[in-house]
């Protein structure tokens, strides 16, 4: 694993800290290491939730390492099987990822956060996609994911002028889940992670699968698709041990014990 990444396991929760000099910028080597971490998280049955954050209090990540670019790393370089920053192109991840944004999330750093399922950010966090000002485009998900979250006028301004969005504005638009003080950031992210651990893993996997499959469908078509039998997790969860455990635990007034099957 790269020395720029610090991995910490807390039971079923994996914390990934990106810690590189010069604004936690990401080059191809670091991106490969991040991809390895996320793919291992995906495939580890003992892990349920991942938290990705940046080292320090100023930068979550400034995105692509422009020093590496100046030294010849191409915008379309191979950044690994998970895409840029290791997460932006993993499309079969059925476990939740929380981005704990501790500061500036610019370019690929913002795209990394957008690839997560939840964003918890510090009050000093700021978001931007300044690629057009550098002669490139935010093609690691920014130009694809942001239009699903914001009105066209706001998206156009952000991607074409690189204008920054504050943490509070991001909260108003619903891009982030929580805004907390810098000192409370990781505590808040861990609290959310524990809430996710308390939910049944198969149910969460089914929800993520349904979101991916039906997000562009009309509601009626989505209903038919869900019930067509083509999904992997949805039919399984309906007949799982966990589906029996949930109601039984509720009736017995105790916490459910999920088995993931």
From Swiss-Prot:
Xref: CDD domains: crotonase-like (cd06558)
Record pathway: Amine and polyamine metabolism; carnitine metabolism
Pfam families to which the protein is assigned, alphabetical: ECH_1
Gene Ontology terms for molecular function: hydro-lyase activity; L-carnitine CoA-transferase activity
Keyword rRNA processing attached: no
Residues the record marks as active site: 111, 131
EC number: 4.2.1.149
NCBIfam families the UniProt entry points to: PRK03580.1
Summary of the function given for this chain in its UniProt record: Catalyzes the reversible dehydration of L-carnitinyl-CoA to crotonobetainyl-CoA.
Protein name (database record): Carnitinyl-CoA dehydratase
Gene: caiD
């Amino acid at each position: 694993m790269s020395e720029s990444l610090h991995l910490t396991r807390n039971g079923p929760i994996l914390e990934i800290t990106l810690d590189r000099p010069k604004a936690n910028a990401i080059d191809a080597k670091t991106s490969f290491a991040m991809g390895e971490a996320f793919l291992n998280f995906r495939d580890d049955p003992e892990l349920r939730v991942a938290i990705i954050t940046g080292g320090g209090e100023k930068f979550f990540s400034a995105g692509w390492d422009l020093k590496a670019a100046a030294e010849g790393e191409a915008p379309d370089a191979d950044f690994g099987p998970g895409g840029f920053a290791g997460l932006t192109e993993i499309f079969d991840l059925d476990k939740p990822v929380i981005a704990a944004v501790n500061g500036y999330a610019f370019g690929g750093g913002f795209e990394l956060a957008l690839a997560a399922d939840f964003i918890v950010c510090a009050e000093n966090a700021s978001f931007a996609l300044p690629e057009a000002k550098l002669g490139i485009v935010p093609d690691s998900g920014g130009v694809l994911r942001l239009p699903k979250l914001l009105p066209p006028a706001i998206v156009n301004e952000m991607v074409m002028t690189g204008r920054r969005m504050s943490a509070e504005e991001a909260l108003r638009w619903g891009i982030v889940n929580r805004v907390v003080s810098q000192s409370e950031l990781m505590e808040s992210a861990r609290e959310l992670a524990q809430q996710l651990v308390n939910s049944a893993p198969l149910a969460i996997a089914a929800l993520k699968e349904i979101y991916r499959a039906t997000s562009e469908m009309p509601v009626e078509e989505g209903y038919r698709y869900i019930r067509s039998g083509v999904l992997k997790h949805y039919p399984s969860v309906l007949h799982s041990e966990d589906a029996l455990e949930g109601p039984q635990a509720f009736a017995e007034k105790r916490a459910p014990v999920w088995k993931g099957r």
